């Protein structure tokens, strides 16, 4: 007698099936785009679908190479601040409480050399990743020794058996070299930027977060980085696998204990570093008979398998050293527009205006919810949205000590907002959040770029394109763009407005137009229509030209609404917590994207089944089935849309659902603000 599956089970199976189709097609498309260096399309996929975890070490350097905030950087300063009373800059006390300055320190500052005690503090913070928590109770492992996963010879016939790894204790020297390399990357950043940014522990955790996806070479200080060196020609590359991964072992006698602990990532905080040894594409390799065994990324490919045929298409030479890539990532995470310049521009425009009301309200007109503000503004918006969207949770949280930390570095708000989820989010969730940051792109014209980067004096629009640049782009990108023909943070008519133009130079001028266009029963005048630009997702008579959708708002503002969505997703759980449990939860958020993570881990299992037998590119039927099941809010046309506020249903363990929830919160909250404003 055949067992009948319940409708719920069938629905779950179909969802997994569609997700596997989509993820496999996404991996193949991403590899194709990497091969032809189509960074515009890669950025689009990163900010909408996310970069497959198997490919972040290849895609992230490309995204950061062309990121506007890296080409024209400006970061928040923790050494100086603007005093509106004296109308001048003042020196801040560093977040790091150091000893009274000595002659040696004063001299080192003048020579742009870091104070003598900074490196020891950096090392102390880095070691917390490896040793801050002991092994699970009952473990015989030394709590002060990390574990390294050493690959053994395997067959390449099955991606799931790419590296059978036995956990061994590395030498202390090897671990020291790993930490030393991370420290040197931070030191290089500080030597370059220390005039405006002093060391904070967030830098250590940003470096560690990058090292969980991008390989580092522990002996970089002894053997300088060379772009001609392949990842696969140099031994001893390392990728960190996260603080909370359980011990992996296929051959030791404690396998049962390891497996049981692996089911609870919150209880096992032992770090595993993946020893990334010689990966060769030479069929005469002396290490293994396999022509292409990835030991350089052995742990990563064990977690997230990638078949031999696809691995062989990946580039082998790194674009950046780890320290260079870390600097670029830090520039994006710590980015801040020039708020002083923005205030001056608003004041000058107000003085030039004949309206005394405009002159008196120029300060209230500065509300850069679209173009982005500094950390203080982001924090203000976060709590403003929090209190508006989740009042039941906001009130008890504001009464708890979790919002009154003794140090900003110990606060979950610090890790969430200033460090973009470093330390507080799980490795998988943080990787997906950073995909969004690194994939952010404004429309490729200087008016729009300067709207977001108001300090910019570089011409860079020629680096970006609004159409895919790969050959046969229709074949690879058409269906993906059809699934997400709008930015997740779209707002009615926002995409059709020429941001940064003379008509819309500031956020408040955009808000005025949005109110005018989206009033219920309102109509769009001819003058309004003349000041619109075509929407990427709109139908055009020219069907041969495929347009990429671009980002609608600043990426750090996007993160605010993603974090609010995380709170909404965990609202009932947080309401039930004891006071002491709340900050622990917020500083160590459990894995949010279980469904996504499981799908990528099991993507190439049962390779003989029909599920995994995909064509070499996305098919119309496959992508059509995905399109029909995708969230409808992402597909609505941009033309004069009136907001329809629906229910914010609790999301499943999928980042797409979380992203859609964040977009809904953004639209709901902003419309409330616009309706209540006096613009």
From Swiss-Prot:
Q: What is this protein called?
A: Oxidant-induced cell-cycle arrest protein 5
Give the principal location in a single coarse category: cytoplasm
Role this protein plays: Required for replication of brome mosaic virus (BMV), a positive-strand RNA virus.
Family to which the UniProt record says this protein belongs? Belongs to the OCA5 family.
Q: Which InterPro entries match?
A: Rab-GAP-TBC_dom, Rab-GAP_TBC_sf
- Species of origin reads Saccharomyces cerevisiae (strain Lalvin EC1118 / Prise de mousse) (Baker's yeast)
Q: Polar residues bias located where?
A: 524-539
Which segments show compositional bias classed as Low complexity? Answer: 135-153
Disordered: annotated span: 135-159, 250-271, 524-544
Q: Which GO terms describe its cellular component?
A: cytoplasm
Sorted UniProt keywords: Cytoplasm
The Rab-GAP TBC domain is annotated at 50-441
Compartment(s) of residence: Cytoplasm
């Amino acid at each position: 007698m055949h067992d009948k599956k319940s409708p719920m089970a069938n629905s779950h199976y179909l969802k997994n099936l569609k997700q596997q189709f989509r993820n496999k097609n996404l991996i193949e498309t991403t590899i194709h785009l990497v091969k032809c260096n189509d960074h515009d399309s890669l950025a689009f996929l990163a900010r909408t679908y996310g970069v497959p975890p198997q490919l972040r070490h290849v895609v992230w350097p490309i995204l950061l190479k062309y990121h506007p905030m890296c080409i024209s950087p400006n970061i928040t300063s923790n050494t100086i601040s603007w005093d509106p009373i004296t109308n001048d800059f003042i020196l801040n006390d560093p977040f790091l409480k150091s000893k009274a300055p000595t002659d040696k320190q004063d001299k080192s500052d003048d020579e742009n050399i870091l104070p003598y005690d900074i490196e020891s503090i950096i090392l102390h913070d880095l070691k917390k990743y490896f040793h801050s928590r002991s092994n699970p109770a009952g473990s015989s492992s030394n709590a002060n020794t990390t574990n390294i996963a050493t690959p053994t010879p395997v067959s390449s016939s099955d991606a799931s058996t790419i590296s059978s790894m036995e956990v061994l204790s590395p030498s202390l020297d090897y671990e020291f070299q790993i930490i030393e390399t991370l420290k040197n990357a931070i030191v290089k950043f500080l030597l370059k930027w220390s005039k405006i940014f002093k060391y904070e522990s967030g830098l250590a955790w940003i470096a560690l977060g990058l090292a969980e996806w991008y390989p580092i070479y522990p002996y970089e200080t002894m053997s300088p980085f060379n772009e001609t060196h392949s990842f696969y020609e140099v031994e001893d590359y390392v990728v960190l696998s996260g603080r909370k991964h359980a011990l992996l072992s296929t051959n030791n006698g404690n396998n049962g204990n390891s497996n049981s602990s692996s089911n609870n990532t919150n209880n096992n905080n032992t770090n595993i570093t993946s020893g990334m040894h010689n990966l060769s594409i030479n069929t005469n390799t002396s290490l293994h008979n396999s022509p292409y065994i990835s030991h350089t990324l052995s742990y990563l490919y064990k977690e997230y398998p990638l078949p031999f045929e696809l691995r062989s298409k990946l580039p082998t030479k790194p674009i950046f050293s780890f320290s260079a890539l870390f600097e670029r990532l830090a520039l994006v995470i710590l980015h801040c527009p020039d708020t002083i310049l923005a205030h001056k521009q608003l004041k000058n425009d107000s003085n030039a205006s004949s309206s005394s009301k405009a002159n008196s309200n120029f300060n209230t007109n500065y509300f850069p919810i679209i173009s982005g503000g500094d950390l203080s503004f982001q924090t203000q918006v976060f709590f403003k949205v929090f209190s508006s969207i989740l009042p039941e949770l906001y009130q008890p949280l504001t009464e708890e000590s979790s919002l009154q930390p003794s140090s900003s570095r110990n606060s979950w708000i610090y890790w969430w907002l200033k460090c973009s989820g470093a330390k507080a989010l799980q490795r998988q969730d943080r990787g997906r959040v950073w995909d969004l940051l690194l994939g952010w792109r404004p429309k490729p014209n200087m008016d729009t770029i300067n709207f977001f980067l108001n300090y910019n004096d570089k011409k860079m629009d020629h680096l970006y394109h609004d159409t895919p640049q790969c050959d046969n782009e229709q074949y690879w990108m058409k269906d993906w763009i059809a699934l997400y023909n709008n930015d997740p943070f779209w707002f009615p008519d926002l995409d059709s407005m020429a941001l940064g133009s003379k008509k819309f130079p500031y956020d408040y001028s955009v808000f005025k137009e949005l109110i005018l266009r989206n009033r219920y029963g309102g109509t769009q005048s001819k003058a309004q229509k003349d000041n619109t630009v075509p929407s990427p997702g709109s139908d055009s008579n020219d069907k041969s030209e495929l347009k990429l959708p671009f980002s609608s708002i600043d990426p750090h503002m996007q993160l605010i609404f993603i974090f609010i969505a995380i709170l909404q997703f965990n609202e009932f759980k947080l309401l039930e917590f004891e006071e002491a449990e709340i900050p622990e939860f917020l500083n160590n958020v459990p894995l949010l994207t279980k469904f996504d993570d499981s799908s990528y881990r099991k993507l190439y299992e049962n390779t003989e089944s029909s599920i995994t037998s995909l064509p070499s590119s996305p098919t119309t039927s496959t992508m059509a089935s995905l399109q029909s099941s995708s969230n409808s809010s992402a597909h609505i046309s941009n033309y004069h849309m009136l907001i329809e506020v629906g229910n914010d249903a609790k999301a499943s363990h999928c980042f797409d659902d979380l992203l859609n929830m964040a977009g809904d919160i953004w639209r709901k909250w902003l419309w409330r603000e616009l309706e209540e404003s006096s613009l």
